[in-house]
Amino acid sequence: MEEKERPFPEKRKVLARAMTLKNYVGLGLGSIIGVGWVVVAGDWLTRGGPLGAILGFFLGGLMLTVIGLSYAELTPAIPVAGGEVAFAYKAFGPGLSFLTSWFLTFAYISLCPFEAVAIGWLIEYLFPGLKSESLYTVGGYSVSFLSIVAGVALSLFIIILNYRGVKNSARFQTAATILIFVCVAAFVSIALLRGNFANMQPLFAGSGTGIAVLGSIIAILGIVPFFYSGFDTIPQGAEESAKRLNPKDLGKAVIASLIIAAVFYALVILALSICMQWQKTITYEMPTATAFQAAFGYTWATKLVLLAALFGLITSFNGFFIAATRVLFATGRAGLLSGWFGDVSEKFQTPKNAILFVGSITLIGPFIGRSSLLPIVNVASLAFISGWLIT
């Protein structure tokens, strides 16, 4: 095949090579964690009970590791931007590669305004004194001045950070992910020292019979893939690995992200379950944040959890922004979309037009508000599943 006919030719515009193994683990892990462990942990306990939720997340992580092994094999073999787009082309040709690129581009891009909206909601919860009056209502949800300012400010920060070079973005992602684990380690330690394992009873949701136990685990398995999504951001940035990095380390980063995330979720569920009776914990709006204050009177622990959640939201935002721009860039460079998306900044060696395009769409999110969250989740989930099924 002639080079001009190949969507991934050897002579092509390339991105800066600056990411280390630590950066890739930070990219995958930071994208996985997000804020679900704070916002919907009560739902995990409701569905499975403490042990049911822990087993569900471990088994789910184990099953996704099988998919991760495929990524671990393909990413070093085809270390170019776009991940699944390149994988699909190598296996099926430009037709299915084009479909894959559309599904994944749509999925990743839709998640960026989701994060921009969520940041305003979280900041209002973290600093209730800053909460402002509603400016207008969209879909039954109010949109405040604070939520708009917070969403726009974070979006601009992510856009500028990524435009000015992947090295800065990767360093920030790694540092923020480490801070999340420091915060989480603190409140897990408190729970282990002050909590009571008797609070975990009953261990499973339902009657406790064999069928109920199995049902508890299956109920968690049904939602696990959503909370592990993010490890697939690593292949999107494979082209930007530092020259000294062994390509096989990219595969190690994928597997490491999944394993560490499984341990993270298990510890969070355990800590939440032993600090007080979990049947009472699930009645709180943000159980992971409020349970520690209710159980031990530690207001600072609540703030610590919310601070970790704030960093989690930012790392998932940054990770999905990187993935969205790399898929769009790779598709444009391949000629499957306008070549405009494949342009690279001469100064920073970043996909400048892809960044500006995704950034522009992201900036719309804060003005729509929380009414957009559920539709975004539904559409993004369908797009991700469609893209993954092809590859």
Question: Model segments located where?
Answer:
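Transmembrane alpha-helical segments of multi-pass small-molecule transport proteins
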Residues: F57-L59, F127-V166, F181-F187, A354-I361
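TM-loop-TM module centered on a large, flexible mid-protein loop between adjacent transmembrane helices
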Residues: A86-A88, G93, Y125-L130, A253-N318, ...
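Membrane-interface "cap" regions at the ends of multi-pass membrane proteins
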Residues: M1-G42, T46-L51, L64-L69, V80-A81, ...
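Helix-loop-helix junctions that connect adjacent transmembrane segments
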Residues: E10-L15, I54, L130-L146, A175-L304
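Juxtamembrane helix-boundary/capping and inter-helix hinge elements in multi-pass membrane proteins
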Residues: G49-P50, I78-A81, K90-L96, E239-L250, ...
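Membrane-water interface regions at transmembrane-helix termini and the short interhelical loops
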Residues: L15, T75, L99, A153-L179, ...
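Hydrophobic alpha-helical segments of multi-pass membrane transport proteins
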Residues: C183-F187, L328, N378-T391
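Extracellular loop-to-transmembrane helix junctions
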Residues: A16, V40-Y141, S257-L267
